[in-house]
Amino acid sequence: APGHSFQGALALEQQALPKFRRQTYFSGFGEGWGLYTEYIGEEMGIYRTPYERFGKLSYEMWRAVRLVVDTGIHHYGWSRQQAVDYLASRTALSTREVNTEVDRYISWPGQALAYKLGELTIRRVRAKAEQALGPKFDIRKFHDVVLSLGSVPLPTLEERIDAFIADGGQGLPGVAYP
């Protein structure tokens, strides 16, 4: 299951959804899907060399650190310099990238949180479905259901996965699964 391009294209193809639903973008869902696909890349064995693994872990660390930085700025009142120092000391980002990122977090409160929180939500509802469905769980059906929603608020995703579980993990109507 590829990332943003695939998710966005499938959202646009969902003719059963109203136009505004096909074209709306919720950061938690969209960015969460992007990070989730990086996570499943690990399951699929995409990161084969130590350099690929290091790159993945480096980006994962950056996504975790920005949870702290955004909260530090907007809840604890950190100065720009405190945020820069924290991000620079805990990631592999260049000085230019650190400054650009901190300015983005300052000007767009909470947006940086959406990435990791979205990923964790998708992973959590997947684990819930895997546990509830046991051997009936089918990863393709799960991904089909998630992507058929378009971009939705995370509580809506969770409600749909609860329905997927209640339906016994059937997947999408009209789709023939091998």
Predicted regions and their residues:
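N-terminal maturation segment of proteins
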Residues: A1-P178
